[in-house]
């Protein structure tokens, strides 16, 4: 059984294709016998604060007398605790103007904290989030995978890697606005990727036993 942290960031709520594909991925894992324990956030409904100078300083350890700032630091601590307690992080990241949604960026601004999720060394930052892998679901109107127009993929790989999450899989639903058949093809491709990633729990367990000590968790 795995602890799964789910982050939905679409502004379109339940009509969002990204959110629907996340639900399908979680249902596929359940059908495969994983029995996940879910913690789910709709980031677009959380009204997360925008990073500004006082908040940035407080997140780096400065003492701020403002109650509102202290509340946000406490929220940051809570979100970080959720992340560190998870085995699998599922991120919904639809492409908006070539990048991630604003609310998802706000979440990262609260959890990517020096001395909490990464630390500086003499050569390179070291991630402090251990034993977590990530799956990103990203829908796009056009086809951007592997192109310079895709800022979503490199940003998420970089910020997750900064915190120590190196194993990141992407489920892309692309070309959704291409007519006449782009949407159907994009959804079919995403569902094929979901089927590939939703490996039956028994198969994962056998791999873990076979390749010990390289596999530490059944996720």
Residue spans for each PLM region:
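Cofactor-binding loop segments of dinucleotide-utilizing enzymes, especially the Rossmann-like FAD-
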Residues: 9, 139, 173
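Gly/Ser/Thr-rich active-site loops/lids in small-molecule metabolic enzymes
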Residues: 111-117, 159
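A structural motif corresponding to the C-terminal end of an alpha-helix
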Residues: 82-87, 132, 163-168
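Short, glycine-/small-residue-rich phosphate/pyrophosphate-handling segment
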Residues: 120-163
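Short histidine/acidic/glycine/proline-rich micro-motifs that form metal-
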Residues: 11-13, 141-144, 177
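Glycine-rich phosphate/pyrophosphate-binding loop and the adjoining helix
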Residues: 146-211, 215-219
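N-terminal beta1-alpha1-beta2 submodule of the flavodoxin-like/Rossmannoid cofactor-binding fold
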Residues: 1-93, 99-109, 113, 192-216
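Residues at the starts of beta-strands that form the adenosine-phosphate
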Residues: 3, 37, 132-133, 167
């Amino acid at each position: 059984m795995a602890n799964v942290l789910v982050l939905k960031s679409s502004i379109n709520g339940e009509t969002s294709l990204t959110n629907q594909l996340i639900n399908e991925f979680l249902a596929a894992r359940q059908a495969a016998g994983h029995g996940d324990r879910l913690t789910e956030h709709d980031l677009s409904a959380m009204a997360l604060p925008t990073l500004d100078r006082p908040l940035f300083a407080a997140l780096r350890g400065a003492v701020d007398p403002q109650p509102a700032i202290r509340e946000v630091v406490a929220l940051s601590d809570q979100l970080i605790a959720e992340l560190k307690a998870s085995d699998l992080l599922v991120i919904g990241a639809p492409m908006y103007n070539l990048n991630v949604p604003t609310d998802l960026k706000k979440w990262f601004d609260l959890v990517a904290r020096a001395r909490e999720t990464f630390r500086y060394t003499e050569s390179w930052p070291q991630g402090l989030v251990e034993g977590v892998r990530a799956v990103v679901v990203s829908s796009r109107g056009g086809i951007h995978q592997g192109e310079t127009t895709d800022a979503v993929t490199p940003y998420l790989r970089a910020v997750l890697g900064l915190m120590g999450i190196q194993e990141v899989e992407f489920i892309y639903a692309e070309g959704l606005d291409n007519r006449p058949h782009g949407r159907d093809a994009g959804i079919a491709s995403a569902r094929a990727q979901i089927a590939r990633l939703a490996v039956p729990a028994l198969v994962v367990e056998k791999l873990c036993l076979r390749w010990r000590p390289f596999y530490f968790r059944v996720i």
